[in-house]
């Protein structure tokens, strides 16, 4: 029986049904932050697993407000998920304090890794600054996530990509890569397919919040400071 981990499992019944159908065994939950649309299913899932005789389900997270938390992780925490996979946790105090992104990689493999970003990085955008600042978001997006290999898969917490890319064109109306990506994502959504995952490379080419050092983005924000540009552009997105 294969062992698997979950990311922000908010619908326990659907998850358990899928796990049973596939003959899997749950070992861990990676929780990005405490908001109920991400962590709201943790306690129910842990309880139902126990009723099925599954003890020892680990719940990772960086905030004691997370339901069912068993293992608190901090920035740079590294752990093994299953026999061949590990994860590294990055703490980002900007959407909420204690928000964690998880980079999952396979050992001794040439496959691209996957980063689970919750509400820090969306495809084409980023989360609101509920408990954090533009400086903290800059560190998360530019100093950490943008340094990942461009082929790294990005799994974010919400399907906001069309709206984000439409907003992006108000910032960079001449960005051809952005125009092409928006049309491609619209086709996916029209056929009821998800836009997630994306890649770090796509974000670097089309996400204005990851392009705050680009001349056109700085000019749009009327500043030469990338952090001020990030603050201005996120505030514009709030009103979009």
Curated annotation (Swiss-Prot):
Pathway: Secondary metabolite metabolism; methylglyoxal degradation; (R)-lactate from methylglyoxal: step 2/2
Family: Belongs to the metallo-beta-lactamase superfamily. Glyoxalase II family.
Keyword flag Ribosomal protein: no
Record EC number: 3.1.2.6
The reaction(s) this protein catalyses: an S-(2-hydroxyacyl)glutathione + H2O = a 2-hydroxy carboxylate + glutathione + H(+)
Leader sequence segment: none
Pfam families in the cross-refs: HAGH_C, Lactamase_B
Described purpose of this protein according to its UniProt entry: Thiolesterase that catalyzes the hydrolysis of S-D-lactoyl-glutathione to form glutathione and D-lactic acid.
Binding site for Zn(2+) 2: 37-38, 119, 158
InterPro entries membership: Clx_II_MBL, HAGH_C, Hydroxyacylglutathione_Hdrlase, Metallo-B-lactamas, RibonucZ/Hydroxyglut_hydro
Cofactor note: Binds 2 Zn(2+) ions per subunit.
Binding annotation for Zn(2+) 1: 33, 35, 95, 119
Biological processes per GO annotation: methylglyoxal catabolic process to D-lactate via S-lactoyl-glutathione
Binding site for substrate: 128, 158-160, 234-237
NCBIfam families, per database record: GSH_gloB (TIGR03413)
Keywords assigned: Hydrolase, Metal-binding, Zinc
Cofactor(s) listed: Zn(2+)
Lineage, broadest ranks: Eukaryota, Metazoa, Spiralia, Lophotrochozoa, Platyhelminthes
Full protein name: Probable hydroxyacylglutathione hydrolase
Keyword Metal-binding in annotation: yes
């Amino acid at each position: 029986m294969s062992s698997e981990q979950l990311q922000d499992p908010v619908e326990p019944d659907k998850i358990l049904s899928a796990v049973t159908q596939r003959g899997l065994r749950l070992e861990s939950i990676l929780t990005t932050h405490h908001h109920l649309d991400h962590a709201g299913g943790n306690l129910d899932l842990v309880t139902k697993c126990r009723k099925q005789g599954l003890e020892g389900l680990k719940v990772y997270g960086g905030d004691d407000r997370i339901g069912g938390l068993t293992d608190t992780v901090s920035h740079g925490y590294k752990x093994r998920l299953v026999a061949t996979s590990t994860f590294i946790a990055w703490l980002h105090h900007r959407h909420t304090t204690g928000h964690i992104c998880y980079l999952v990689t396979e050992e001794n493999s040439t496959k691209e890794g996957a980063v689970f970003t919750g509400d820090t990085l969306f495809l084409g955008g980023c989360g609101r600054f509920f408990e954090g600042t533009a400086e903290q978001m800059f560190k998360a997006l530019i100093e950490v996530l943008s340094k990942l290999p461009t082929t790294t898969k990005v799994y974010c917490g919400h399907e906001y990509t069309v709206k984000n890319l439409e907003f992006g064109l108000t910032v960079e109306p001449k960005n051809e890569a952005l125009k092409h990506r928006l049309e491609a994502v619209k086709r996916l959504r029209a056929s009821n397919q998800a836009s997630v995952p994306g890649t770090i490379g796509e974000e670097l080419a089309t996400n204005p919040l990851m392009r705050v050092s680009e001349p056109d983005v700085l000019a749009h924000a009327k500043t030469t400071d990338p952090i001020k540009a990030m603050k201005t552009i996120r505030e514009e997105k709030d009103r979009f």
